[in-house]
Amino acid sequence: MERPISVLGTAPDVVVENVEEKVGWLRRKFVPREFPYLEWTVDGVPLRKVVAWPTGDVAGEVTPIENEYAAREYQADYLRAILGEPVEREWTIMSDGRVPLLVCSTDFDLNCRALTAELLVSRALVEWRDIAWQVDYEPLDLAEQEQPVVSLTFDRRQYEAIVRPLLMALTES
């Protein structure tokens, strides 16, 4: 059976999180803060919506791409991982080798929760296999997912035409 080929893209997006801020000498309160970033799209649909819960709720996790709170070096390593290339920081990927697609919007910590996939790269295709939520401190159990586990397949040339320029912009400037 032939796998459907999806088209990877990107779109600017913003997630709003309540963060604690100092509002006086001793007083703190939670205030909404916008976290702009570049979201993956699959066939024109934001990845967060592709993996939305049955209620329609979407996760607060984001990509670190074009995210002012993510260090450029981390953004570059994240994109290397998405391309299936070696990373400089081992904490960029899960300890089981899975690649994070979406990470915590406030600190990018893989132990908060991350949407991950087994990345398979062949001559012609890239596959995000068994997309699932996981934390790095526990083994992944696909049977315990709260929503169906899906896989996505992309044409490698089209995929790299989206991802590689993002990496080059970070490493060549």
Predicted regions, residues:
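Intrinsically disordered, low-complexity acidic regions enriched in Pro/Ser/Thr
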Residues: 1-173
